[in-house]
Amino acid sequence: MARRSILLSQRLLLMDKFNSIADAIDCGASMTEQATGRLMDVDGGTCALGAAMVAVDLTPITANLPLLVKRFPQPMPMICPICDGEMPRSSHYKHLALLVHLNDFHAMPREQIAHWIRSQLS
């Protein structure tokens, strides 16, 4: 139990290095190839969300998505920049779900996803 607490403390410190989830995506994207359909593939490739997780030393096994949401809050739903107006019912996403949608459905490069997030948060 103490080891788990130490690991959580280390991950929180890693998360504090990043001002936004976009920064974490950029960092993780620089360490891995892009993957779709899963957080991390068998070759170590990651989706946008997986890249952010790699940056803070999380894996699909140690994933703590509530911790990511708490550290990188998104106060309102975001609208998919590609689906907007085309599919109104499915173009509204909350926080981390939009990262998965842009990565998997639109095959948007992770760095472009990070750039778009920054443009929405500024």
What is each model feature region?
Residues M1-T46, M53-S122:
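Domain-length accessory/inserted modules outside core catalytic folds
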